[in-house]
Amino acid sequence: MLNDVISEYEAHLKKATEALRHHLASIRTGRASSALVEHLHVEAYGMTMPLNQLANISVPEPRLIVIQPYDANMIKAIEKAIQQSDLGLNPSNDGRVIRLPVPPLTEERRRELVKMVRHRVEEVKISVRNQRRDAIDDLKKLEAEKLISEDELHRGQERIQQLTDRCTRELDQIGAEKEAEVMAV
């Protein structure tokens, strides 16, 4: 019982950490990365599909993303999806491939991105705290139903707090690394 609650809580922490990593990977820094565009949704064949299913995405230079659609008829739809995204990138095409130059970020834009990173990290920390509260409530219910002892309840609460502290440190580190990446000129 106790281990089930703790295992479930650990799984939530892993999901939250991975979700943060995934979200931060899509935030543009001054360097080109396929992660910036691979999950853009493109209207294709009567439905919405992620770009990485419609094209080969490569980064031949530090400030250039090259997108080679599997179907040349998709170039306009892919360009439209890029222009409608909030990336602020201007695609150009030669009929076969789309070139996406990634300009260096202005100081003002870097500061905005750092704020976005901090905000997202804080949102995930709030989610972690809410999960902690739910896990502790689950333990208290088990104790009230006499399925675990009071000592087990306290051990469980301590373990959950240790996991929360470790996860919070990891989230802070992920955020700090992304901030440093954004601020690097």
Swiss-Prot record:
It comes from the Bacteria. GO terms for cellular component: cytoplasm. This is Ribosome-recycling factor. GO terms for molecular function: ribosomal large subunit binding. It comes from Chloroflexus aurantiacus (strain ATCC 29366 / DSM 635 / J-10-fl). CDD domains: RRF (cd00520). Responsible for the release of ribosomes from messenger RNA at the termination of protein biosynthesis. May increase the efficiency of translation by recycling ribosomes from one round of translation to another. HAMAP family: RRF. Pfam families: RRF. GO terms for biological process: translation; translational termination. The gene is frr. Belongs to the RRF family. The keyword Magnesium does not apply. It is found in: Cytoplasm. Keywords: Cytoplasm, Protein biosynthesis.
